[in-house]
Amino acid sequence: MTFTIACLDMAGTTVRDDSVVLNAFGSAISGRGLSPDGYEQAMKDVRATMGQSKIEVFRRILGDADTALDANAAFEHHYARAVRAGEVTPLPGAVEAMAAIRAAGLKVCLLTGFSPSTRDALLDALGWRPLIDLALSPADAGRGRPWPDLPLTALLRLGGGAVTELATVGDTRSDIESGLRAGAGLVAGVLTGGTPPAELAAAGATHVLDSVAGLPALLGA
């Protein structure tokens, strides 16, 4: 099978955040009327929906649309502060993997549940713009994961000819489900985000890798 586009998730797949995302969620929902039990349940929901659109997660947890928007803004502020402080760094092998994939003639697209502004701040802080062809957030595609919109938008914008030319990689069930729904020819899961290998396999991953460093070999790069 020939692949022309590789779609790589950011946090947990190419980017190490050492619980920065979880801490940002916790900070964003604290003091918003949740009981202690409600807070704990909300954080369980956050962990279970990692990889999905952040604003959609807040809407499910908090219910009220305006409160969700406020919480999302607080999340973005917390995460952006962590980025500026240098707390968010590349995972080992991520830069080399993207470089190898592009050198082999494939296009590289980074996918994230972050807003475009947070995504762009992260790209600039990491210096990754020269390494990629495109970066997409749910706001660019219509819906976030687990829907297929992000990889399908990458296919359209980067001029792919068929969905089977897509290869996707991520660290959560939502990443796997999105790739499968898009019809990608390769849907890989990685263990760097903490999801157990059995869970990634049960979600339908075609391959389970220790890290994104193993992706180029699967793509013949």
Predicted regions and their residues:
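Acidic, Mg2+-coordinating phosphoryl-transfer loop and its flanking beta/alpha structural elements
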Residues: A167-H207
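N-terminal helical cap/lid subdomain that shapes the substrate entry/recognition surface
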Residues: T2-E96
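Conserved Lys-Pro-Asp/Glu-containing loop-to-beta segment of HAD-superfamily phosphomonoesterases
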Residues: R145-I176
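Short acidic, glycine/proline-enriched helix-loop-strand junctions
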Residues: P151, T164, E199-A221
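Surface-exposed amphipathic alpha-helices with a cationic face
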Residues: V95-R102, L155-L156, I176-R181
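A short, structured active-site edge motif that brings together acidic residues
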Residues: D45-V46, W128-G144, E165
